[in-house]
C-alpha cells in the first residue's frame, strides 16, 4: 500500500454506510484525512457505526444535512446513490470533487488492475479471470474485488506489486473514477439497463466506457466482438484491442470454431467441456481466456478452471435435483438478455419463474426464447401480468400468477415433469419485493430446500 499524502488534512465526506463506504472511510482516516460518514438511514445494527466512531470518524445518520458540504474537499459516494441526491447535487454545484471507492483503491496500490464491466456476465467473468490467474501460480496472487462483494479499497491495502486486482465495476462506480487505469479492461457486452439511474442509454454506455478513458497503447482492451456497436466502442480506447467472439467473428483473440475454444491459432479445449451451462458462459469463458493469455497463462491452467468451475452464486447456479427435476437459481438475471441466455443454455423443457420490478419494459423480446422450450411459467411481482402476456403470446401451456419467487417454488414443482429444468431467471430487478437479487436468490434456495424436506417426509 502506498501512503499517499494527497488526502492528509483534507475534509472528506463519505456518503453511504455500505461496505465500500465503511472501507473508504477507514482508509481515508489512515491516510490522514478528516472524515465524516453520512447515511440517510439509521442502521438497526450499530456495530459498523461504533467501529467508525472508535477510529475517530464522525458518523451522521437519519438525514442528509446540507451543512455537511461546508468546507469539504472531497466526496466519496456510494455508487448506488443517484446524482440527483440533495448532497450529491449540492456538491456538484459547489465544484466539490466526487469519486467512488475503486478510485481510492487504484491510488494506493502498486498492484496491476484488471477492470471488468458490461451489462451481463461481469461477476462470472471476474471470477473466472481470477481463478485462471491463480491457477499454477507460484509468485503473486490475483484478488477479486469491486461490485462482486469485497471492496477494492480493502484488497488494495493487502496487495503488492506482484499481485493483480481483478475488479468488477458497475456503471455507477465508473461514473466516479478520474485516474483509475486498468492494465486490462474487459467489456463483456452492453444492453439496455439502469436507464432509471442514467436517464438515457447513451449516458449508460458512456459511463461503462469510462473504464478505458485512462488507458494507453501499453494496455489491453478485451471486448466482445459479436455486436457491431461493441466493435465500434473499442475505438474509444487507445489500448491494444483483444477481441473475443463466440460467433467466430474475429480470430485475433479468443473465439469458438468447430466446437472448440481457441486463442488465436491455439486450440485450447472443446466448448462442451466447460462445466457451467449456457452460451453466455461460453462468452464469459472467452473473455477470461483472453485476459489469461495476456498474462501468459498456459492452456492447462485455463482448462483446469473451465472444467471444474461450477459457477457463481445466483448466476445459473445449480441448486438440487428433486425427483428428476433440476432446480437452478439465476436471480442475477435482472434483464431480458440475461434470461434469454440462461434459457439458451438448457436443452430440457423448462418451467420458468420470472417477474419483478416494473421498469416500463414489455417482454415481447422474450417470446422467441420461450417458444418450444418453456412449457410452464410462474410469474410474480410488478411485471407478473406483462410476463404472463409474453408467455401466452409464445404459446406457453401453463401460466400461474403467484406472490413472489418463494411461493413460486411449490407451484413450479406441481406443473413440472420428470426431466424438467425449474429455473428462476426473473428478467427483472428484485427491488419491488427484495432489497437485492442476492436476497431473492437465497429465499428461492430456501424455498427449494423446504420443498425437498416436505416431499421427503411424505
Curated annotation (Swiss-Prot):
It is an enzyme of class 6 (ligase). It catalyses: UDP-N-acetyl-alpha-D-muramoyl-L-alanine + D-glutamate + ATP = UDP-N-acetyl-alpha-D-muramoyl-L-alanyl-D-glutamate + ADP + phosphate + H(+). One of its GO terms (cellular component) is cytoplasm. It is found in: Cytoplasm. Its main location: cytoplasm. GO terms for molecular function: ATP binding; tetrahydrofolylpolyglutamate synthase activity; UDP-N-acetylmuramoylalanine-D-glutamate ligase activity. One of its GO terms (biological process) is cell division. Its EC number is 6.3.2.9. ATP binds at residues 118-124. Gene3D superfamilies: Mur ligase, C-terminal domain (3.90.190.20), Mur-like, catalytic domain (3.40.1190.10), NAD(P)-binding Rossmann-like Domain (3.40.50.720). The keyword Metal-binding does not apply. Keywords: ATP-binding, Cell cycle, Cell division, Cell shape, Cell wall biogenesis/degradation, Cytoplasm, Ligase, Nucleotide-binding, Peptidoglycan synthesis. Pfam families: AlaDh_PNT_C (PF01262), Mur_ligase_C (PF02875), Mur_ligase_M (PF08245), MurD-like_N (PF21799). Pathway: Cell wall biogenesis; peptidoglycan biosynthesis. It comes from the Bacteria. Belongs to the MurCDEF family. Cell wall formation. Catalyzes the addition of glutamate to the nucleotide precursor UDP-N-acetylmuramoyl-L-alanine (UMA). This is UDP-N-acetylmuramoylalanine--D-glutamate ligase. The gene is murD.
